């Protein structure tokens, strides 16, 4: 708190405090500490290394037959100025309900239907049935480190989710 007062002052209102906190978090999340962009793919884009034959085949599959790049786009994001592997849209992929999801064990009133809960995604937030089941297209950055996969963690491995799409 002393550092906060030193930076933002003693007279900051509750609203301005929240705005300052939000700004500080957003700045940190944009920093190189959180987003170093140091993958082999980044080095390849910068001309600092070559991809192996197998990696090039994978990239071609990602861009073409796999259709991955339709949603996990390979162009620089306007805001980030880097490839984020997401188009920031919401899609319904039909991922099955995950019986291992800890939410199913949450008691009422937070989960009133128990194991029969369906996550309606964006549709629940917007109260719009045409948006039911839509979830944000995630980034694929460091994807090998972020298991499980799918909006609800249904897929335990990358192989499982790739097979689901195929």
Regions of interest found by a model, annotated:
Residues 37-164:
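Short glycine/threonine-rich turn/loop motifs
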Residues 1-56, 60-61:
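Extracytoplasmic redox metalloprotein regions
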């Amino acid at each position: 708190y002393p550092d906060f007062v030193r930076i933002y002052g003693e007279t900051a209102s509750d609203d301005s405090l929240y705005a300052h906190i939000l700004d500080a978090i957003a700045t940190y999340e944009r920093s190189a500490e959180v987003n170093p962009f140091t993958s082999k793919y980044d080095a390849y884009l910068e001309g600092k290394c070559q991809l192996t034959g197998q990696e090039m085949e994978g990239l071609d599959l990602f861009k073409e037959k796999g259709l991955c790049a339709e949603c996990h786009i390979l162009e620089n994001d306007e805001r980030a100025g880097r490839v984020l592997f997401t188009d920031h849209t919401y899609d319904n992929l039909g991922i099955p309900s995950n019986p291992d999801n800890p939410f199913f064990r949450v008691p009422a009133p937070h989960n009133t239907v128990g194991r029969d809960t369906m996550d309606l995604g964006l549709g629940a937030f917007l109260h719009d049935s045409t948006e039911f089941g839509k979830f944000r297209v995630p980034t694929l950055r460091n994807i090998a480190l972020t298991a499980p996969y799918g909006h609800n963690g249904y897929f335990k491995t990358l192989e499982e989710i790739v097979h689901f799409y195929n």
